Amino acid sequence: RQKRFEKTLSFVKKHLKTDEAILDLGKTNKLSDFLRQNGYVNLANTSGEDLDVDFQIVTKYRAITAFQIFEHMFAPFNLLNSSEGKLIASVPLRLWFAKEYWNVNDRRDCHYHEFSIRQFNHLLERTGWKIKDYQLWKSYDKSWGIRPLLRRFYPRFYIVYAEKQILQADSEE
């Protein structure tokens, strides 16, 4: 986990200034705390609302991060379509040898979407985002077994930096 946090921080530093007001989708967690400890003091988290329905908060920010959030949303299209500015988002990639993640005891802890790179890119493009940079990371899981071994050879995480033109209201002449 620490290695993924450090790679995430490096990617964020490349694209967002530490003094920017940033909305991090999802409740406060170890990664958002790590980013704050490394200078991103204006990072705010959502408070656990259902972002499929209640996503208007994104319109108040021009920089949004979403670290492994969109796979948990039933309809991420709506939130992405409503937001503008800068976006850094990461998703775990669908792997041909692994079943989707589904926690039967907690409906919020399920993957409604297991994205391929092409699918995630298409989602961003359909909602007006232009991908400017991306990275692929392999899993650093030290567990034993066939799946953990295969995850060391196939990219497991996909992180993108994208921008969406902020639409200006037509001025009256």
What positions do the PLM features span?
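A structural motif corresponding to the C-terminal end of an alpha-helix
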Residues: 123-129
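Short N-terminal helix/helix-N-cap motif within the alpha/beta-hydrolase-1
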Residues: 74-78, 99
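A short beta-strand submotif of the Rossmann-like class I SAM-dependent methyltransferase core
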Residues: 63-69
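A structural micro-motif
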Residues: 20, 41, 85-86, 129
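A short glycine-rich, Lys/Arg-flanked "PGG" loop and its adjoining helix->strand segment in the class I
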Residues: 77-89
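Short, glycine-/aromatic-enriched active-site segment of Class I SAM-dependent methyltransferases
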Residues: 89-113
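Active-site flanking residues adjacent to catalytic metal/cofactor-binding acidic residues
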Residues: 23, 67, 89
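Conserved N-terminal segment of class I S-adenosyl-L-methionine
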Residues: 1-63, 77-80, 110-118, 122, ...
